Each structure stands twice: as C-alpha cells, then as structure tokens.
Amino acid sequence: MRRTGRSYKPLLSQLKDHHIPVHPSSRAERAMESRTLLVLLFVGVVTIVSSGLERAAAQDDTDDGILPSSDVQPLVSNMIGQGFTVAAAVAQSLQTLIPIRSTLLIPSNNAIAGVDANLSQEDIINTLQYHVLTFPTSFEALSRNDVGAELPTMLQGEMITVTSNSPGNFTLNEVNITHPDVCSSTRFIACHGIDRVLAYNSSLVTAAGPEASPPFGAEQASPAPEALPPGTRSPNNTANPSNRKSNSTRSSASRYPVSE
C-alpha cells in the first residue's frame, strides 16, 4: 500500500535539512541515498508527519513528542554495546527527530547492507515508519502476545503481525528478534534488534544479512518500558486484548502487554 504525498513531502523536507540527498543524479548516488535514508528507521527518527507536527526546538520538553537530549547518549551507548553501530551513529547526529514513547525495531548492520538500493523514495519513507511501533514495550511484554496479534506502527493503517511466540523463537512478520531490550537505559523508548528489514509490502521483502544471528530466547529478556498498545488487535480483532484471560497452557498470565 502506498501513502499519499501529505506525509511524504514533510519528511523529505526534514531529510534535506540534515543534508540527506533526495534528488540523486547517478546510480551510485541513488544507491547511497537509499541506504542513507533507510538507516534512519533504525533509530526511530520518523516524526508523526501525518499530523503535521513541527520539530521541537526545546529537546528537554517531553510534551513535544521528541526524545529528551538527556536520553540520547544512553540510547547511543546501548546501541553501540549491542553492535548496532549504524543506528548509534544516526541517533547521535539526528537526535532532534527521535520520537518518544515508541518501540524501534532496528535491523542489524548486515541487514542494512542487504537492502535493495533501487527502492523508490516513497517506499523508503513508508519503510521508515513501519519499523516504529506506536507504543513502548519490553520484550517480555511483547512475547506475551498471541500468534496472529497485530501491532500498530507509525505507517498509517499498517500492522506488524506476531508470527511466533515460542520461548526460543519470537518473530514478527517471520523476522527474528535477536537482541531484545537494546535501549534498556532510556526512559521513554524501547528498541529491539532484528535480523532483517521488515517489509510493509510483500514486493519489498529482503533477505537476512550474511551473518544473521539466531533468535533470542525469551527467558533472557531484561526490563524495559511497557504500555498497552492502544491499537493492538488480537487474531479475532478484539479491542484492548489485555482485558481477556489467556487460554494458553504456557502461562496463566495475560498474553498481552499490561498497562502501567
């Protein structure tokens, strides 16, 4: 599904402000543009462009939807410590665009290298937003979702589906979470490392990186912020699934993130 220019053009304008080329003239420049823009998704620098929010000047005001400056360095340090060095570099340079109270799904450096350099600019923008869940959640809470549960993303109308919730193989859209709770030191944001780029469109499916990591076992997860995702849907499309009792034999607890 393609989005209209209403949300596309404002984000392109912001990318220009950060010296990201958006009108390449050669094949080499197009390849550089695609990879440069795609790494933005790994640190959640997508703003809520569909509502026309302007970038805030005061970074310490958490009401403007931007990550406070005091949380940027812990975010960067967490990413470097887990090997997501591309994400860390972009977070450091584009810190005024990182949204708060969200969950970032960050592909590995190897996954970035495998991205098709010929993606259209609109596909790139949509892909950026598709890697940001609209609520912060720890891996422990995320892993309690039923298979088939749909999680809302910043790409309007597009969901990410839980495709496996077994203890040693938790996947979203068949993509493994290999590094849960990467950003455990931040107050407002959660992020989890994945081994492939998530494709909102089946024609954009990419392969895992050349040295993809195995799935991470759920029992190793560490604490991180969690909240009930307002738009999460269960397999039968029941709203607010945290109010349901789970029938799972694996656990008697709710299989959905618990509200704070």
Swiss-Prot record:
Residues exposed to the Cytoplasmic side: 1-35
UniProt-listed SMART domains: FAS1 (SM00554)
Glycosylation site positions: N118, N169, N176, N201, N236, N247
Transmembrane is among the record's keywords: yes
Pfam families given in the database record: Fasciclin (PF02469)
Keyword annotations from UniProtKB, A to Z: Glycoprotein, Membrane, Transmembrane, Transmembrane helix
UniProt superkingdom: Eukaryota
TM spans (from-to): 36-58
Gene Ontology annotations for the cellular component aspect, listed alphabetically: plasma membrane
Membrane-topology annotation of the record: Single-pass membrane protein
Secreted in keyword set: no
Family annotation (SUPFAM superfamilies): FAS1 domain
Comp. bias intervals (Polar residues): 233-254
InterPro entries: FAS1_dom_sf, FAS1_domain, FAS1_domain_protein
Record topological domains on the Extracellular side: 59-260
Subcellular compartments: Membrane
Main location: membrane
Residue ranges annotated for the FAS1 domain, each copy included: 59-198
Disordered: annotated segments: 210-260
Protein name per Swiss-Prot or TrEMBL: FAS1 domain-containing protein SELMODRAFT_448915
